[in-house]
Amino acid sequence: MAIQNADKTNFKELISEDFVIADFYGTTCVPCKLFSKILEDIEAEIPFLNIIKLNTTENPEIAAEYGITAVPTIHFYKDGKLVDSHVGVMQPQAVKDV
């Protein structure tokens, strides 16, 4: 499944799908760009994985609602429930281990 961009109109719907990795990022954040490449590589390796990205600059209300205070922040959801989170860039194996 391709990496999907989320916004306030579809975020809650997207995180309700089975297991989802949500990447909260900022437009000018250099570490976010590095992590984006890591997610692209993981998606290529595991194409059935649900990965969504939410731009916190363009969607500050969603970022506030989910307690995002720094980027990148990665949330892991199972059937809409937060099961794990991480602030900062994660190494590929750490993402896969969740």
For each feature predicted by the language model, list its residue ranges.
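N-terminal leader/targeting and pre-domain segments
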Residues: 1-18
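Thiol-based oxidoreductase modules, predominantly thioredoxin-like and allied folds used
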Residues: 4-6, 24, 36-61, 68
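Short acidic active-site motifs
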Residues: 10-11, 58-62, 94
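Conserved hydrophobic/aromatic "anchor" residues
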Residues: 11, 24-25, 66, 77
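Short active-site neighborhood of thiol/selenol oxidoreductases, capturing the structured segment around
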Residues: 15-27
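Short cysteine clusters
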Residues: 29-32
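Structural micro-motif
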Residues: 66-75, 93
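Non-catalytic, surface beta->alpha helical segment in thiol-disulfide oxidoreductase systems
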Residues: 76-98
